[in-house]
């Protein structure tokens, strides 16, 4: 009996077969029933119970934060260059960096929507994560062991079982071929993890918003990868360029994609362009 023969995971297996990971075995990413110790064994036992009692469906199954971190560690085994780039950049920020930033906390108190971009897979509420009594300098993480956890893992922007047909396994591609696959706008390798739904939405299914500079419409890139970036690097509710966290390119750079200038994993510049973003 294999994973693919069990009807509960048929849809996931079909996606896997047509994905860039089709040459990777299920156990290489998910482990075995025993690899997660007692916790993993209890989970698999629960799945067997659900199978026979019909009390759980495919849609009810999702990864908790511990499992997401474990999968991200396994991503790094093959995606070593991407892991190194991520570790060197801002997207590897931790819970401590985000939620213990006193200066930022004085301007805006941490609340539930922070998890939309920072800590998407956190299992609890902001009050489970932090003690918010007193002044900003008194606020702290309730569990100190969570301080160095990454606030944005691989699965924040990537869907493992994403339908992205490949004519060559990713691990067999050279650096140039990998770069092409990462910036492919026809079948992007990115997806937005929606915390509220506990599901991924492929980047090419996201809405291409309209941005404004005063009364003028500013063209937004046609690259779905840029639409994903805009979910967190977002403008105010009037969609004004340079407002809030918006980084929409303007002027000579209008219509360019984030990936035209930035490494997708480190977020660092890969060219000499400057003054691309207008800041309000």
Regions found by a protein language model. Name each.
Residues 1-280:
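Short sequence/structural segments immediately N-terminal
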